[in-house]
Every structure is written in structure tokens, then in C-alpha cells.
């Protein structure tokens, strides 16, 4: 395994407030919200700003929830104010197409993160190759990384690298990885990837480990860290950007951003937009404990309210069934099963 010094190495700061953060408000950012947040992030000198519906390009749908605007409207708004950061987006094969990718490129996107379930990297080939042909930076994004072993994950990252990905991410979509889990996965990735291929960490805060896991990732050779202002993201949110930067600053790491501007943006712009606090609570903790896809939270809360159930019960059952991103339609099925069980139990009494 190659070792890395962290003191002088520049950490690439990838903000996800305008993509993952969209989950926290059911994809209802206004164009003006996107513009204000992007301008604040750009002035704070983050390296990239990811913009899209929470479920990536063309995620706006019955299954995932309709966005207040189209992806291109958000992207154009961000492109109108950004001067330093690269504009990034997320694409899930099967939801977004190469046509959508080309349209995003024309709108100003220069980095695409092609996201698959952690054992399904083979479906990313077409989109990664298309991105490279367009001259975009292509990043492999292995979601729900807690659901497979470090060795299998490394093999999947190697596939993405072979398609042209120049960076591969460990994505803790369920916020379920421990610090040792993170260590093991980055060691495995670094053992098989080319020296020039970057690695990245995308954490969720469901077990309050978002910042800790990001720090461990960097200590294990990770080059890029995803984070969001005020932790704005699915479930209990992502690693809070301003908190990670404060910790990195105290550790003497080279992050290149303005901590105070990030703190102001988090509290003055982003936090007031939350219609449900982004925090660790009973429901979001259940996500991390059960290893459930973080964006299932709001859908599960809706189903629980509709059928008179506890959100936690739905989430834990989803974890038992090992549901993954893209299976949002199963949330209602699980709720109805739990309702039937409750009624049959009451009838038996």
C-alpha cells in the first residue's frame, strides 16, 4: 500500500449542497437559492460545486420526487455566478442518459460523477466513456459502499478506472460505515488503482461520523472530500463542510478554502431553507443503524404519516430487506406489509 502525507497535499473540496442537499428539502431549491449558494461557495474557493436533482440528472419523477426546476435551470443559474469552482453533476445510469450528459456539458458542467450501486460498476461504462469523449472529468461513484467488502469495492473501482474514470469514490450512502470500514476501503482501493487515479470520500452523518470518516479517509490517502454547507443532505446530512474545514484547519491540512465564509453561508443562507432540521434524530439514526439509503428518509416519513406507522419501523424493515437506491417504490410496499402485520396481530388478540 502506498502511504501519503496529508500536511502539504491539497485536499480537493467537493461541495454537494446543491445536489445531495436537495433531498433535505424535497428538491425544492429555487433558482435564486442555487445562485446565492453557488456564489457563496465560489467566493469561499471550494474546488467544485455539484448541481442536480438529488437523484442526479433527470431524477425529477414520481419515484424520486419532482424538482422545483429542471437540472438545466439550476445549472445555468450556478454557471451565471461561478468564477473559480468547476461545476459538477451526478448521473445515475438508467435515470440520466448520455443525451442529458451532453446537455449538462453545454450548460457548463465539467465534472460528472457516474453513480452506481457498489457492485454494479459495469453499468457505468457508456456514461464514463461519453464524458471523457466530451472532455469532461469522469468520476466513479460507488454508492452504498457498506454493503460489500473492501476487496469487492476495490474491484468495482478498478472497473470504473478501466472505463476512463480519473477518480473513484467510496460513497457511504447509508451513513453506516465505521472509521475502520473507511480505512479498509481506501487501503483496498489504493492497492489496485493506478497511482494517478484519485480517490474520494462521500460521507453521511447518520451515526455522527461524517466528519470523522472524512478525516480518516484523508489520512488513508483520499484525495477528495464531499461535504455540504450545514450538512445539507439526505438523512442526517453529509459531512458538514464548515465543520470538516475547521477540523482540517486545526490539523494543518491544505484545503484552500475560507472557513469564515463557509460558516456564514451555512448559517445565513442554507440553514434557513430547511423545512425539517438536518440532524441526527430518531429517524435519521435508524438510517445509519439499519444501513438504509439516506434519501429514503423523507419518502418513509410520508408513508408513515399516510398509513399511521412509525418511520423507524419502516426504515428498519427496509434495512432488513437490503433495499438500495432506486427502490423507493418499495417503501410503500413495506409500509403496507407492516400495516397488514399490525392488523392481523390485532385480529388475533
Curated annotation (Swiss-Prot):
UniProt cross-references to Gene3D superfamilies, sorted A to Z: 1.10.8.60, Aldolase class I
MF terms (GO), sorted A to Z: 2-isopropylmalate synthase activity; 4-hydroxy-2-oxovalerate aldolase activity; manganese ion binding
Domain (Pyruvate carboxyltransferase): residue spans on this chain: 11-263
Keywords: Aromatic hydrocarbons catabolism, Lyase, Manganese, Metal-binding
Pfam families per the UniProt record, alphabetical: DmpG_comm (PF07836), HMGL-like (PF00682)
SUPFAM superfamilies: Aldolase, post-HMGL domain-like
Active site per the UniProt annotation: 23
This enzyme's EC code(s): 4.1.3.39
Binding residue positions for Mn(2+): 20, 202, 204
Keyword Lyase: yes
Annotated catalysed reactions: (S)-4-hydroxy-2-oxopentanoate = acetaldehyde + pyruvate
Site residues (Transition state stabilizer), renumbered to this chain: 19
Keyword Manganese: yes
Binding positions (substrate): 19-20, 173, 202, 293
Single Gene Ontology BP annotation: L-leucine biosynthetic process
EC class of the enzyme, as a word: lyase
UniProt family annotation: Belongs to the 4-hydroxy-2-oxovalerate aldolase family.
Protein name: 4-hydroxy-2-oxovalerate aldolase
Organism: Bordetella avium (strain 197N)
Source taxonomy: Bacteria, Pseudomonadati, Pseudomonadota, Betaproteobacteria, Burkholderiales
Amino acid at each position: 500500500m502506498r502511504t501519503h502525507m496529508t500536511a502539504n497535499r491539497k485536499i480537493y473540496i467537493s461541495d454537494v449542497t446543491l445536489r445531495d442537499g436537495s433531498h433535505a428539502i424535497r428538491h425544492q431549491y429555487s433558482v435564486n437559492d442555487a445562485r446565492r449558494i453557488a456564489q457563496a461557495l465560489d467566493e469561499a474557493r471550494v474546488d467544485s460545486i455539484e448541481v442536480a436533482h438529488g437523484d442526479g440528472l433527470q431524477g425529477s419523477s414520481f419515484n424520486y420526487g419532482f424538482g422545483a426546476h429542471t437540472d438545466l435551470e439550476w445549472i445555468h443559474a450556478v454557471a451565471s455566478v461561478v468564477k473559480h469552482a468547476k461545476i459538477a453533476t451526478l448521473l445515475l445510469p438508467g435515470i440520466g442518459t448520455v443525451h442529458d450528459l451532453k446537455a449538462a456539458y453545454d450548460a457548463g458542467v465539467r465534472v460528472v460523477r457516474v453513480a452506481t450501486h457498489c457492485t454494479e460498476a459495469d453499468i457505468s461504462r457508456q456514461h464514463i466513456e461519453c464524458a471523457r469523449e466530451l472532455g469532461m472529468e469522469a468520476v466513479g461513484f460507488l454508492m452504498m459502499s457498506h454493503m460489500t467488502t473492501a476487496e469487492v469495492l476495490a474491484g468495482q473501482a478498478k472497473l470504473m478506472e478501466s472505463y476512463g474514470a480519473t477518480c473513484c469514490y467510496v460513497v457511504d450512502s447509508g451513513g453506516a460505515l465505521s472509521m475502520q470500514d473507511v480505512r479498509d476501503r481506501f487501503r483496498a482501493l489504493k492497492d489496485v488503482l493506478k497511482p494517478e487515479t484519485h480517490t474520494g470520500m462521500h460521507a453521511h452523518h447518520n451515526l455522527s461520523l461524517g466528519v470523522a470518516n472524512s478525516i480518516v479517509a484523508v489520512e488513508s490517502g483520499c484525495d477528495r472530500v464531499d461535504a455540504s454547507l450545514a450538512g445539507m443532505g439526505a438523512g442526517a446530512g453529509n459531512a458538514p463542510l464548515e465543520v470538516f474545514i475547521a477540523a482540517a484547519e486545526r490539523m494543518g491540512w491544505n484545503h484552500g478554502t475560507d472557513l469564515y465564509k463557509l460558516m456564514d453561508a451555512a448559517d445565513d443562507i442554507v440553514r434557513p431553507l430547511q423545512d425539517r432540521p438536518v440532524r441526527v434524530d430518531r429517524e435519521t439514526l435508524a438510517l445509519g443503524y439499519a444501513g438504509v439509503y439516506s434519501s429514503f428518509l423523507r419518502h418513509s416519513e410520508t408513508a408513515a404519516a399516510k398509513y399511521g406507522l412509525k418511520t423507524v419501523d419502516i426504515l428498519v424493515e427496509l434495512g432488513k430487506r437490503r433495499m438500495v437506491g432506486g427502490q423507493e417504490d418499495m417503501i410503500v410496499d413495506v409500509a403496507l406489509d407492516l400495516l397488514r402485520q399490525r392488523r392481523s396481530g390485532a385480529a388475533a388478540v
